[in-house]
Amino acid sequence: MPWRKTCDPYKILVSEMMLQQTQVERVMPFYKDFLREFPTACALAAGSLADVLKAWNGLGYNRRAKYLHEAVKRLSSMPNVMLSPSHGNKIAYEDLRRLPGVGEYTAKAMRVFAWDEPEVLIETNIRAAFIHHFFPHTLDVHDRAILAYAKEAARAQDPREWHWALMDYGAHLKKTLLNPSRKSAHYAKQSKFEGS
């Protein structure tokens, strides 16, 4: 996965926005094409919304493209904030949460994958791993129950490597077993993609 080969905050933000509600295999070609069109945060901020939507076309959930464009423009206008790999300033969780289209998970994922900050992430594959091991006979497992285990397990781990390993393991479980995430109180079956 190309976003695992970078710590560039801009490229991490692009990947996290694209991966919302969309599977990795579907995102990969769009991610590469989008970054060819908009290789830097400055290029995206300077681009028109029409060009951004054109580059996003076919991925679906086009509101994410609009939010990404708005978020990067907003970040570009903030003093002491730059989305570039050479700029050492980390963006605070609270500032990330104020951006359009950036929820709790995306803000924490940005901090983990761009700056190796010790946040604790819960997403579908991580949820599957914890449910499989700690709640094998429980239905309607809430994320707050998983969070206690996730916080303890994440201690003294490299944040990036730990979360990537959990994501990969959870994805493996979902392919080889009945999806453990179905026991989550947050589970909702997605309909098949039919264009956008």
Question: For the regions a protein language model found, what residue spans apply to each?
Answer:
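Catalytic cores of DNA base-excision repair glycosylases
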Residues: 1-195
